[in-house]
A protein has these predicted regions:
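Intrinsically disordered, low-complexity Pro/Gly/Ser/Thr-rich segments with frequent PxxP/GP/PP motifs
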Residues: 255-263, 630-661
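Extended substrate-binding grooves/exosites of carbohydrate-active enzymes
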Residues: 1-30, 181, 186, 285-606, ...
Length: 986
């Protein structure tokens, strides 16, 4: 099929399309919709390039009986055509803008629709909500038009092409076009008609578009201004009703603008998403629009909504599903929004394109602030050879090739969603540099809609400030370090509000720095918040493995090139929306109430209301429990005092502390007081826990007077330590017990610094591998032992080393074994600070496979780390080895428990228990560290025939360095010198 080559012509973005308008569905006066959904099963033909498409497939009499069928909407890769591809930065095609490969996969779609005689006389429009990447449209064999911009809507008037009765619609979709260079988003690349297609039948004259803007007046009044644009002669009548359908005021028409004044207006916020209903009626049509009265502005470098300093607790969200790909239903979107609301999110950035047009309607209704982002990302230019240019990302922009396209995409985003109160910020796009095109697009945006904020992070790449950025209201960064944030606010002079449009990269086991960033968000009024990268793991469901696990595919699993591996697996939830532990960390860090201990003896606490618009007493109920080493002392509920947003109130908990050496912890749990559409009453929104009494250092169990010392037998390498019912082999070469036998079962020990790298270890991993940490070993310099009346004491000086490079650490270890077989270990270590920080330092125990029962006194029940433990609390927990495993799709270090006092693994008869004078990190797994390190998918994992148990002096934090900053020093196992004492009982 010979096509006009619009798809490689940046000067021809659209042919035959209607002027942009806001999204709405018109109804007749009888309240019947004027929209017909054309979605369903369409005829489909897949071809390797446009020239292979039959030229007559567009004709009504074309025999399409041999064509396949495909659901519309859908992505054709999800139905067996073409192949999936995941790439982040790199373009999937040769870089030759505006040209794309000649072998350009093409999908030919056909369907029919029927018009009555009356409908055929009206005006008819086709409305495409989303097509990737570009498409040509024919009706009844006649060319209607062409459009692109995958995630924005395109509308065509087809009145002159339709007939009474059956009409044939043919659409040809191309995989790539010149717009592909502007749609280089970090996602799986898919194609097709992936959103709904609507047929609109409208009267000869109608309301074409309208604009709603709201303002606040002193005294609590709200103003709603509506401008209406008509196609033809109409006399619109406007009414505004409250949520109970009662009219509120009358519209006053001045200079073509309708204005409602609402006394004592109920304001829209994410916490209180109150909506009025605007109705625009003509003789033949009715249009309704939800209206939220709210105002957003900046004063003195601070973002305000309705007069209150606002903090965004947000996430970046792609349209993504492991089965349906880009095609997302309302039910799927509501599933996401439900989880977000339940995990304390209040904001969404539509990364990096407009979501389905009804998505902002849902955000209006359920209460989310939205950064509405245009369908632009061009960071693939970074892979080209232009390293001498400061503004590499902006080269495509500066060249002028896509100047018109950038403006077009920004306009389509803004105009479509302009009437939604949830949209506080327009984002011009993502990672596409800053040049003339963005300067012009930014100016247009601010002029068109001065009532909202304008955002664009990539303006920071214009280091020499060659271009005007005055229209940008926010200083936006990605993954700025905590030091950079402090530096920004330390500078003198006026400044824009600071926002992290992406931060705390949530890939795999992580993120681990949420609390550190949140402390800064609350410290600086001008830090208006951040958006986690990102909401969900992107993957393709490839079926079920023999072991019953879902096989999720990511980059490289589809035979594609180029690809970026599992970098798409970077969400807070799994592809099926099962929460990662990281989203629990987020939930509790951004909890709506934060307590601080004022008086531990009286158990008086100050409760701070972290909500922005709601009195704490109206939103929260509070329960408490106090435990001593996991044993319940008391529990109850406390009345929540009336507390305005961002203020504190004190409460006293009726707790009598026992005289005990145990750790006494008070836990406060915050629950929702009333139901929200997405959150039930009584839903836990967070907790705080405080140590009321206890000892940082505990004395370990001492030897009883009647104990008899074990015997020691020397060999050429091993010391055999024997006592009643046990035999231990101590390796004088390595400085640790090679075997511990008791009750017919044997375990072994080794020093351990290696862990299966997490996704967030991907950068430091190179240093660890260069340092050969994965080949570490120990050798002793000296070993001595002594036997007194009750114990055996073995002392070794040890070098922790590896091949090729220098010593990692040197330490003295003292092992004390009593007659009952209890082992006490004391280590005095000095680390070589020329070497990278360690993944961990501790001991690894290899246990019998039958030992599957686990109990521990420490932080749980979720996995937790030194920088990711706010999701957990200190308590006594019981579990199983299987349940201690967090099944990341790409296997990695997991299942750690921070700040443990005690941990036991066994089978009910035999087992091992660890104690520490201070605390330790603990984990146990059916998989070896090596297995977790080398396997690419969780369904490939094979269980060991033993159980691996780790006791660590310190396990380094997980951070977010897969894309974010380096792990903060305080969370690294970088101690220059340290002492550690622990005890093992069998």
């Amino acid at each position: 099929m010979k096509l006009p080559n619009y798809y490689e012509d940046p000067n021809t973005l659209h042919v035959g399309t209607c002027e942009n308008r806001s999204y709405y569905i018109p109804y007749g006066q009888d309240l019947n919709s004027h929209a017909t959904l054309l979605s369903g099963d369409w005829r489909f033909g897949y071809y390797p390039y446009p020239e292979a498409v039959p030229a007559d497939f567009i004709n009504p009499d074309f025999d399409d009986s041999s064509m396949d069928t495909i659901p519309v909407p859908s992505c054709w890769q999800c139905h067996g055509y073409d192949y999936h591809q995941y790439t982040n930065v790199n373009y999937p095609i040769p870089f030759d803008p505006p040209y794309v490969p000649k072998e350009n996969a093409s999908g030919a779609y056909r369907t029919t629709f029927t018009l009555s005689a009356e409908a055929a006389k009206q005006r008819n429009f086709l409305y495409f909500e989303g097509v990737d990447s570009c498409f040509y449209v024919w009706v009844n064999g006649k060319f209607v038009g062409y459009s692109q911009v995958s995630h924005s809507s395109s509308e065509f008037e087809i009145s002159s092409f339709v007939n009474e009765g059956t009409n044939t619609l043919a659409v040809l979709v191309l995989k790539w076009c010149d717009g592909t260079y502007l749609e280089d988003q970090d996602k799986l690349r898919m194609s097709g008609i992936f959103r709904d297609v609507l047929l609109l039948t409208r009267p000869k004259s109608f309301v074409r578009d309208y604009t709603v803007r709201t303002f606040l007046k002193d005294g609590g009044a709200g103003v709603v201004r509506v401008s209406v644009e008509a196609d033809g002669e109409v006399s619109p009548v406007l009414t505004l009703c409250d949520a109970d359908k009662n009219p509120v005021g009358e519209a006053v028409l001045t200079d073509g603008v309708y204005e409602f004044t609402v006394s004592n207006a109920k304001l829209w916020t994410a916490e209180t998403p109150y909506l009025y209903t605007l109705t625009i009626s003509t003789a033949d049509e009715v249009i309704t629009q939800a209206v939220g009265i709210r105002e957003v502005y900046i004063k003195d470098g601070i973002v305000y909504v309705n007069g209150q300093n606002l903090k965004f607790r947000g996430t970046n969200r792609h349209d993504s599903d492991p089965v349906t790909g880009y095609t997302i239903s309302k039910e799927q979107a509501i599933r996401d929004l439900t989880l977000m609301k339940q995990f304390n999110f209040n904001a969404i950035r539509t990364s990096h394109y407009p979501n389905a047009p009804w998505f902002t309607e849902l955000c209006d209704r359920y209460g989310f602030y939205v950064i509405a982002e245009s369908d632009i990302e061009m960071h693939g230019y970074l892979s080209t050879y232009h390293s001498d240019r400061e503004n590499t990302l902006g080269l495509l922009d500066e060249g002028g090739v896509f100047t018109e396209a950038v403006l077009d995409r920004v306009q389509r985003n803004v105009i479509r969603d302009k009437n939604h109160p949830c949209v506080l910020i327009w984002s011009l796009g993502n990672e596409a540099g800053f040049g003339y095109a963005y300067q012009n697009a930014g100016r247009w945006t601010k002029e068109y809609d001065p009532t909202r904020l304008t955002h664009y992070e990539s303006s920071t790449w214009d280091h020499s400030n060659r271009f005007d950025k005055s229209m940008l209201d926010l200083y936006s960064r990605m993954y700025a370090t905590t030091e950079e944030v402090d530096s920004y606010f330390a500078e003198e002079g006026p400044k824009k509000p600071f926002i992290q449009c992406e931060f705390v990269h949530a890939m795999g086991n992580g993120p681990g720095d949420i609390e550190d960033y949140y402390q800064q968000i609350m410290k600086y009024d001008g830090f208006c918040g951040g958006f986690v990268w990102e909401w969900c793991d992107h993957a393709v469901n490839q079926g079920v493995a023999e072991n019953g696990k879902t096989m999720y595919g990511y980059g490289g699993d589809f035979g594609e090139y180029p690809h970026d591996g599992n970098f798409c697996m970077d969400g807070l939830v799994y592809p099926d929306r099962t929460p990662h532990t990281g989203v629990y960390e987020w939930k509790n860090v951004v909890r709506p109430v934060r307590a601080r201990l004022v008086d531990a003896h009286k158990v008086t606490l100050a409760l701070k209301n972290m909500l922005d618009f709601t009195d704490m007493a109206d939103a929260i109920t509070l329960s408490y429990e106090c435990k001593a080493d996991g044993e319940l002392l008391c529990s109850g509920e406390i009345a929540v005092p009336s507390t305005a947003p961002h203020t504190e109130s004190e409460v006293t908990i009726p707790v009598t502390l026992p005289k005990t050496a145990a750790d006494c912890y008070l836990k406060l749990t915050y629950l929702t007081k009333t139901a929200h559409e997405l959150v039930p009453a009584g839903h836990e929104v967070g907790f705080d826990q405080f140590l009321l009494s206890g000892s940082a250092v505990r004395r370990l169990n001492s030897v009883t007077d009647e104990a008899t010392a074990p015997t020691v037998t020397e060999g050429d390498r091993f010391l055999t330590v024997s006592g009643e019912g046990f035999t231990y082999q101590y390796d004088t070469f390595t400085g640790i017990f090679s075997s511990l036998e008791r009750g017919g079962e044997t375990i072994s020990m080794d020093y351990s610094i290696f862990r299966a790298p997490t996704d967030n270890d991907r950068n430091i991993r190179e240093e660890w591998e260069r340092a050969n940490y994965h080949h570490s070993q120990t050798r002793t310099y000296t070993t001595e032992y002594a036997v007194d009346g009750q114990t055996v004491q073995i002392t070794s000086t040890v070098n922790l080393c590896t091949v090729t490079v220098q010593s990692i650490m040197k330490f003295t270890v003292i092992w004390t074994i009593d007659g009952a077989g209890t082992i006490t270990c004391k280590i005095d270590a000095k680390r070589n600070t020329d070497m990278p920080y360690l993944p961990r330092f501790g001991v690894e125990l290899t246990l019998p496979k039958s030992w599957q029962q686990v109990s521990y006194l420490g932080y749980g029940p979720q996995e937790c780390y030194i920088d990711k433990h706010h999701l957990a609390w200190f308590d006594a927990f019981e579990s199983t080895v299987e349940n201690m495993h967090e099944d990341y799709i790409k296997p990695q270090e997991n299942g750690n428990h921070y700040h443990c006092r005690k941990a036991s693994v066994g089978n009910g008869t035999n087992g091992v228990t660890a104690y520490a004078a201070t605390s330790f990190d603990f984990s146990v797994s059916n998989y070896s560290d090596y297995e977790l390190a080398v396997k690419k998918h969780n369904y490939e994992l094979e269980e060991s025939d033993f159980v691996t148990m780790h006791l660590d002096y310190k396990n380094s934090g997980v951070g977010s360095n897969s894309c974010g900053p380096q792990l903060l020093p305080q969370y690294q196992m970088n101690d220059k010198e340290f002492e550690w004492e622990y005890q093992l009982k069998f």
